[in-house]
Amino acid sequence: MAIVSAEKFVQAARKNGYAVGGFNTNNLEWTQAILRAAEAKQAPVLIQTSMGAAKYMGGYKVCQSLITNLVESMGITVPVAIHLDHGHYEDALECIEVGYTSIMFDGSHLPVEENLAKTAEVVKIAHAKGVSVEAEVGTIGGEEDGIIGKGELAPIEDAKAMVETGIDFLAAGIGNIHGPYPENWEGLALDHLEKLTAAVPGFPIVLHGGSGIPDDQIKEAIRLGVAKVNVNTESQIAFSNATREFARNYEANEAEYDGKKLFDPRKFLAPGMKAVQGAVEERIDVFGSANKA
């Protein structure tokens, strides 16, 4: 299966009552881990780059080339979309130009009418090149590349207006946040999600901040209409924990590890890479997208 737009497989998820994962990558190893997990689970997947991660990796063209060539060299057979996560207007246009197959234009920080107008412009440009479009109403809590939100509930009328711009899937605040959830978090506003999906029947909703939400709430959100769940923090924590454990073991057994040449960065990064793959596979199972390729 070639790299594709996300439109068809996100729509299929919405229609059939499961969700696909949008997994953020940060480097070569993360990309390989996500692809291996998707292939092992035979699940369609979006590999996402935030603006910050793309800058770190060398730019959008580098990211697009890396993912495209890894899909080919690794013999990946499942559908893979290359997706921009929380992109500004100029970034969205650049990603369309360099070959991303899906983009999120995040104008949630703009006045509603300006957000709608710019989203409509992006949709026209993207769809002309077969690129799927995600947009956001309200703001998702937490911080994502300088955009800070408090976890508000997306206004229903704004959501309906955003869908009318022609987007393919909609990110809407339902009490979710980016990053670790605080102990006093009240949970997803599932009653609001139910009202939202009733207002835009059959339309795919995106759940951002998927890391740390209890599985039962995620599954209920999927039942109510969520068709894409974004994951980043969970993978970061898995990578960090595995790498720290390896480093602690190295320090305790330095002579032995040196003898095995475990200072080789390929070996040093391997435990974290394996942990990311495991985290992605586990999320795919929860989302119900295994064997849906």
UniProtKB/Swiss-Prot annotation:
Give me the gene this protein comes from.
fba
Q: Which CDD domains match?
A: TBP_aldolase_IIB (cd00947)
Q: How is the cofactor bound?
A: Binds 2 Zn(2+) ions per subunit. One is catalytic and the other provides a structural contribution.
Q: Is Zinc a UniProt keyword of this protein?
A: yes
- Xref: SUPFAM superfamilies: Aldolase
PANTHER family linked:
D-TAGATOSE-1,6-BISPHOSPHATE ALDOLASE (PTHR30304), D-TAGATOSE-1,6-BISPHOSPHATE ALDOLASE SUBUNIT GATY-RELATED (PTHR30304:SF0)
Q: Where does Zn(2+) 2 bind?
A: D106, E136
Which cofactor does this sequence's record say it needs?
Zn(2+)
A single GO BP: fructose 1,6-bisphosphate metabolic process
Q: What class of enzyme is it?
A: lyase
The residues that the entry says bind D-glyceraldehyde 3-phosphate are: S50
Record flagged with keyword RNA-binding = no
**Pfam families per the UniProt record, alphabetical:** F_bP_aldolase
Recite the lineage of the species. Bacteria, Bacillati, Bacillota, Bacilli, Lactobacillales
**The name this protein goes by in its record:** Fructose-bisphosphate aldolase
Where is the catalytic site? Answer: D85 (proton donor)
- Task of the protein: Catalyzes the aldol condensation of dihydroxyacetone phosphate (DHAP or glycerone-phosphate) with glyceraldehyde 3-phosphate (G3P) to form fructose 1,6-bisphosphate (FBP) in gluconeogenesis and the reverse reaction in glycolysis.
Family statement: Belongs to the class II fructose-bisphosphate aldolase family.
Q: NCBIfam families, per this entry? A: cbbA, fruc_bis_ald, PRK07315.1
